[in-house]
């Protein structure tokens, strides 16, 4: 839907001197999500308390299945793990952000890849899966992570909107951690 996340990922990769590979994954045919369809609007709220726990219109069908299918790329590059920043605590209603999803997909990699059947499967690592947003912010700050390069907003403007579910959960996490968010937001957030 927008290139802002790709720009952010590139900056984070450069910060860590990591290889940055862009894989084209056109999901625009998935018309039921506000993140892939130009016909649906990303919901806007005034506070994180308005974010519902049911499956929202921003759910992209099988998105993490598609992302984790890139285990083949990891295997072909000689890697042994895929790190994914999924989070289930401040749950946004996404079924593919739950521990049982990642456990099931790990079983798929164990039996469905060459390295898996040879006893050394690509491991799915979910380091922040059980952490609150505030815990994530505190850990990232402690580790010196380049939070100024991270992007959570579902919209692709120059500044984060501050009103989509993702922005509100991020802002809540920074507020609860007592740390200023280095990302710029539209208006007076």
Q: Which residues does each PLM region occupy?
A:
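Mid-to-C-terminal catalytic subdomains of enzymes
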Residues: 84-91, 146-162
């Amino acid at each position: 839907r927008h290139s802002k996340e790709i720009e952010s990922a590139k900056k984070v990769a450069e910060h860590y001197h990591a290889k940055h590979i862009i894989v084209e994954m056109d999901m625009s045919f998935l018309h039921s999500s506000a993140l892939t369809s130009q016909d649906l609007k990303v919901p806007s709220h005034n506070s994180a308390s308005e974010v519902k726990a049911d499956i929202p219109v921003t759910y992209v069908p099988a998105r993490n299945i598609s992302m984790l299918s890139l285990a083949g790329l990891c295997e072909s590059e000689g890697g042994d793990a895929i790190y994914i920043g999924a989070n289930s605590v401040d749950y946004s209603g996404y079924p593919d952000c739950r521990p049982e999803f990642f456990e099931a997909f790990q079983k798929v990699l164990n039996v469905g890849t060459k390295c898996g059947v040879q006893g050394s499967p690509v491991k799915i690592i979910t380091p922040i899966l059980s952490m609150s947003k505030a815990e994530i912010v505190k850990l990232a700050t402690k580790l010196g992570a380049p939070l100024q390069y991270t992007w959570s907003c579902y919209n692709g403007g120059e500044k984060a909107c501050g009103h989509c579910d993702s922005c509100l959960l991020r802002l809540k996490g920074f507020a609860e951690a007592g740390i200023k968010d280095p990302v710029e937001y539209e208006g007076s957030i």
